[in-house]
């Protein structure tokens, strides 16, 4: 499935047109095709139901150790909306726990687990492979220096939506260290709108999600950063050392789903405006 999707990406009109433009600037066709395939492999998820089942079993144990309760509200409307729309989850971002608890909550409610846009800083040895199996696909912080990468990534988002896969990404781009919402970054939002305008079997609907923590798992590192310490890039040793936190209790966790924002309706209401 993953290899077939990568082949489709490379053969798409969007990627081929970008390659043609780069050929006019002196790049060779064979090198561009190898680069495009390398980009696609670096991005694409490799969702495995077997890995997901193992992952979710571990998460059940994890939540029971870490939290005194996980409370969910607003999920009832999602099943009905998913019949007519492909859902795009757009949560607030406070913790690395966010995407774990969202996938877990949706699975326990009998809903499709989303493909999750993750920063390539999480694509570490072993961890990255495991996250891909759970539906993560990886993205660079900036696409500006590489138009071929940008084209491959945008086509990947379109192909996922074309196949009816739910998506998840954080509009803030990164985790908020202060608890306040960060200004939205519009790259992935634009790709979703562009995908809708290209034509999809089902229109898209954005689902706001709020995570409320009594105590944030990364609270101590956030405090250090706010006091002036340098922000650390994630690595495997940090993840392994964080396992000691399971001896603590972090109180209750609340997951609140907002009403889906149907993109087809929104576009129809704004068709006379310059978007």
Give residue spans per PLM region:
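Membrane-interfacial terminal anchoring regions of lipid-handling membrane enzymes
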Residues: 1-275
């Amino acid at each position: 499935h993953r290899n077939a999707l990568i082949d489709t990406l490379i053969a798409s009109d969007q990627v081929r047109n970008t390659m043609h433009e780069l050929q006019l600037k002196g790049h060779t066709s064979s090198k561009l095709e190898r680069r495009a395939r390398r980009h696609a492999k670096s991005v694409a998820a490799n969702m495995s139901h077997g890995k997901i089942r193992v992952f979710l079993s571990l998460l059940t144990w994890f939540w029971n150790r870490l939290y005194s309760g996980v409370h969910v509200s607003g999920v009832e409307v999602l099943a009905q909306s998913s019949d007519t729309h492909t859902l795009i989850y757009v949560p607030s971002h406070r913790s690395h726990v966010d995407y774990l608890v969202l996938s877990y909550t949706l699975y326990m409610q009998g809903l499709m687990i989303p493909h999750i846009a993750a920063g390539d800083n999480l694509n570490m040895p072993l961890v990255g492979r495991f996250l891909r199996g759970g539906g993560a696909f990886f993205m660079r912080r900036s696409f500006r220096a590489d138009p071929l990468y940008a084209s491959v990534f945008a086509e990947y988002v379109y192909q996922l939506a074309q196949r009816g896969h739910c998506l998840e990404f954080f509009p803030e781009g990164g985790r908020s260290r202060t608890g306040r919402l960060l200004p939205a970054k519009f790259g992935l939002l634009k790709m979703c709108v562009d995908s809708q305008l290209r034509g999809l079997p089902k229109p898209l609907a954005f689902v706001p999600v709020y995570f409320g923590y009594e105590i944030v798992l990364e609270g101590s590192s956030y405090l250090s950063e706010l006091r002036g310490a340098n922000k650390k890039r994630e690595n495997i040793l940090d993840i392994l050392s964080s396992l000691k936190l399971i001896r603590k209790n972090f109180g209750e966790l609340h997951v609140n789903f907002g009403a889906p924002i149907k993109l087809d309706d929104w576009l129809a209401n704004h068709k006379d405006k310059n978007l």
